[in-house]
């Protein structure tokens, strides 16, 4: 199985080009104002024009108002929504769009394999469950987490993908993919020179590391 790759937190046209040329399957835009990688709908609409067909655009939100999500739907037309805050299943599903639900592994209630698995089951209609590490704030932490917490998570890739995030970079992504065998990985700070500024070289290194694992697994 080929591991899919999402590069998140893009803010520049040249970084979209680098990700696409390296073989990324999805591009993520962050619509969380507190993030250093935040873009507004107008800017995201400009960037979206650089994304070719067959590369998905994912819109990341943290506890958004419905009108904020609607503005992104209207201006950007993302392929997937991603919810990274305290959104309920009803919050995530109200837009009638495919969505990813992010879980901060290690957070209170999500600090055991059983607790994390139970939380996932509440979002059975999600297109994917994304697992990130816990930090006091919202959004990606850039830190890893104990992948043993995923032991109780069961998902059918045909209906709900497992997406691994949390401190992934070219130096550790191969081991992470080998251990978890996720449908996809989601990487942001691990391929950056600065927040929101991606490194074409690091993106290529990341893709090569993932490909090396996938080839052995065939």
From Swiss-Prot:
EC number(s) stated in the UniProt entry for this protein: 5.3.1.24
InterPro entries in alphabetical order: Aldolase_TIM (IPR013785), PRAI_dom (IPR001240), RibuloseP-bd_barrel (IPR011060), TrpF_fam (IPR044643)
Annotated GO MF terms: phosphoribosylanthranilate isomerase activity
GO biological process, one term: L-tryptophan biosynthetic process
Chain segments annotated as coiled-coil in the UniProt record: none
Source domain of life: Bacteria
Enzyme's top EC category: isomerase
Catalytic activity: N-(5-phospho-beta-D-ribosyl)anthranilate = 1-(2-carboxyphenylamino)-1-deoxy-D-ribulose 5-phosphate
Keywords (A to Z) from UniProt: Amino-acid biosynthesis, Aromatic amino acid biosynthesis, Isomerase, Tryptophan biosynthesis
Family: Belongs to the TrpF family.
Identification of the protein by name: N-(5'-phosphoribosyl)anthranilate isomerase
Organism: Bordetella pertussis (strain Tohama I / ATCC BAA-589 / NCTC 13251)
Gene encoding the protein: trpF
